[in-house]
Amino acid sequence: MRRSIVIVIALTAKGFLHRHLLEKGNLVTALSLRICNSRAFSGRSDYRERLRSGLHSIKFNDALTLFCDMAESHPLPSIVDFSRLLIAIAKLNKYEAVISLFRHLEMLGISHDLYSFTTLIDCFCRCARLSLALSCLGKMMKLGFEPSIVTFGSLVNGFCHVNRFYEAMSLVDQIVGLGYEPNVVIYNTIIDSLCEKGQVNTALDVLKHMKKMGIRPDVVTYNSLITRLFHSGTWGVSARILSDMMRMGISPDVITFSALIDVYGKEGQLLEAKKQYNEMIQRSVNPNIVTYNSLINGLCIHGLLDEAKKVLNVLVSKGFFPNAVTYNTLINGYCKAKRVDDGMKILCVMSRDGVDGDTFTYNTLYQGYCQAGKFSAAEKVLGRMVSCGVHPDMYTFNILLDGLCDHGKIGKALVRLEDLQKSKTVVGIITYNIIIKGLCKADKVEDAWYLFCSLALKGVSPDVITYITMMIGLRRKRLWREAHELYRKMQKEDGLMPIK
């Protein structure tokens, strides 16, 4: 009876999987074959010893070399040994490589077992190749293998990965009809994927269905729902879900508490955030770096920078290492509070602790100095950014242009814009909006109008901000008719609606 699920698949996709594996040989397969062919038989290491010592920390290139050693061995290793290696490669997120290496195994005449089929199906699903995953399922069942709930779990995950949630639920119903019992992991996969896509109401329906089927939700189930509901502002529903969780005797974990602290902090309910922190300590739930980062972020958002610094000291005293998120949050907080020099001190601490700054780090400091009109200090930040191997992006240049325009240095801003254009950098509408606004602010409305009219020649379409900025400039010059005509053009020709 269970085989009925793949009769259609097996008939319609007959040979599809085999053709794919023959036709889609890629660089990884070529590389592995080249290594195999170039190595002398006597130089091989004993693959058995490597397998015995464990594969949890193996690197990709070493895994390929080990695969070649195994493929050259006489007699050939079993599919069980190959599966152990290929599962380790899959854990490195090298799914395409695993698919290619399975093709090589088939060429060597090594037959699949249940676990190798399940691994291959999982890799197809993670590469969003569901038709091949289903073909593989059909092939394995045709050969007499009974898929496990893990196999079906991979397929459900594959459907969710490409947002085919209805088919994921339909597959779960078919699994039940075939006598399998879906576990909480399968339902968690669907609920979490729905929450990630903002389809929380559907996720709540799945939760109801899950309970109806007698599957007990766990803390992972509730964490997905609570996190999404809180972040979407549906406090009433999220509180109800949290109560439901507690009523079922499911204890909140570090993820639950961190999510609550994060939301309360962002909403300015700092006392409640601290209350949640104290409660997790009382419940012997150990905070992690995400918990502390959430606390620091909430304090920084609301300008309590000294308290945020104290939390940083606490996490260090408890043996945690601040990461880029920790430091970036503090730097951003200081810059928002116009304490950019203090932000620079955090960057120095960050560098001392061996944590590399990223584009966000440097752009935040760069923007802080530009907004304060300290362009000399801003240039030093830019120099440090480049010397550390972090490349400025378009946002970096926009920060400079915006700062120059805000401080009445429109001439320098225009020179920088010209330099950008000469460097063949693609300049977008955001950059032109900054310059148009700067020209209007400097009472150079005619120049702004000329730039506005030349946008089409530059291959750039104006957006609502462009129109509104230009209309404000025209109205300041009391050019009412021109402003009104521009408003009509915005609505009729470009189909843009004004911002309320």
From Swiss-Prot:
PROSITE patterns, per database record: PPR
Pfam families reported for this sequence: PPR_1, PPR_2
PPR repeats: 78-112, 113-147, 148-182, 183-217, 218-252, 253-287, 288-322, 323-357, 358-392, 393-427, 428-462, 463-498
Gene3D superfamilies assigned: Tetratricopeptide repeat domain
Keywords: Repeat
UniProt GO BP: defense response to bacterium
Superkingdom in the source lineage: Eukaryota
PANTHER family: PENTATRICOPEPTIDE REPEAT-CONTAINING PROTEIN GUN1, CHLOROPLASTIC, PPR_LONG DOMAIN-CONTAINING PROTEIN
Family: Belongs to the PPR family. P subfamily.
Name recorded for this polypeptide: Pentatricopeptide repeat-containing protein At1g06580
